[in-house]
Amino acid sequence: MKLDDFDFDLPDGLIATRPARPRSSARLLVADGPETHDLTVADLPSMLRRGDRLVLNDTRVIPARLTGTRTRMSAQGEVTARIEVTLMEPQADGTWSALAKPMRKLKAGEKIIFSNALQADVHAMDEGLRLAFNVEGDDFDAALNAAGAMPLPPYIAGKRAPDARDYHDYQTIWAKRAGAVAAPTASLHFDEHLMDALTSRGVDVTFVTLHVGAGTFLPVTVDDVTTHKMHAEWGEVRATAAAEINATKAAGGRIIPVGTTALRLIESAAQDGTIHPFEGTTDIFIYPGYRWQITDALMTNFHLPKSTLLMLVSALMGKDRMDAVYAHAIANQYRFFSYGDASLLFPSQKGQTSR
């Protein structure tokens, strides 16, 4: 299975840099087995049945992009450098793994000043940058919220800088557990009106947590995709969530994760149609040939060429079907990636229909 098999040409103008307003007015491409329907996210309830269960990721994106200064003494006196930092994930010893630009201007033991309230010591660099901050807990959260910016994906950040609108736009309406440095973007389409409509339809929801890491944007660099090593992310399926999902399966309802993050987590926690409580890291890599455990359908945005997420949806729907879905999306001017439109995928090989 070759990486080039998952390539496609995407016009640059189809990369969304702002979300639809209102959220649920985004377009929704429904691939129901061999059938294709062009709808909007507001139509989602009509495509679901009473007793279906949506699985939602309640992670909260932290403002992980920081700009600070590093000062050191030289023969010419005090020298200051501007440093841009993106936090990756917290470590067991209290430090944060991070990326920095320019990395060459940092040495272990130096200090980066981000604001009067927030600074960090360069703790280590031999196996990647580690930062030790001067505050923790609620004080760290407050200082980070004041000094940080939302960590927009590179395909958006390359076109514009993050601004105040992104603090709202790049966060789900139910975001609760802080720790992600990227949003579960399919969930960005949900607003209160849509949630009310789903409740009226008799569609159930369950919340799980997967803290999306910056590794989600890393490219696949191997030609044989089956040899790719996925990044690890921390997630939790609580006992109540597992019980809700199992009850839906037992009653004949469908389990429909919203977003690939929720899907990867529940597949990690499931075996032979039953999901179990789970807490820890997962590096599950889903590509064509994968044996599905718990997922019946998926709502997700449109993904990058050659990405692991495109491989995931190809595993669910079949590669030829996904090639046709993406060709339809491009021909009909759907907007792609994090702030773009959505798809609702019902695989025909499982004998499912949308109603």
UniProtKB/Swiss-Prot annotation:
**Enzyme Commission designation:** 2.4.99.17
Return the GO cellular component terms, semicolon-separated: cytoplasm
The Gene Ontology biological process terms listed for this entry are: queuosine biosynthetic process; tRNA wobble guanine modification
The record's listing under Pfam families reads: Queuosine_synth (PF02547)
Gene3D superfamilies assigned: QueA-like (3.40.1780.10)
Source organism, top-level taxon: Bacteria
Molecular-function GO terms, alphabetical: S-adenosylmethionine:tRNA ribosyltransferase-isomerase activity
Keyword vocabulary terms for this entry: Cytoplasm, Queuosine biosynthesis, S-adenosyl-L-methionine, Transferase
Please name the pathway.
Answer: tRNA modification; tRNA-queuosine biosynthesis
Any idea where this protein resides? Answer: Cytoplasm
This protein's major location comes to cytoplasm
Q: What is this enzyme's catalytic activity, as reactions? A: 7-aminomethyl-7-carbaguanosine(34) in tRNA + S-adenosyl-L-methionine = epoxyqueuosine(34) in tRNA + adenine + L-methionine + 2 H(+)
Q: Does this entry carry the keyword S-adenosyl-L-methionine? A: yes
Function, as annotated: Transfers and isomerizes the ribose moiety from AdoMet to the 7-aminomethyl group of 7-deazaguanine (preQ1-tRNA) to give epoxyqueuosine (oQ-tRNA).
List the HAMAP family hit by this protein, alphabetically: QueA (MF_00113)
Family to which this protein belongs: Belongs to the QueA family.
Q: How does it assemble?
A: Monomer.
This chain belongs to the protein called S-adenosylmethionine:tRNA ribosyltransferase-isomerase
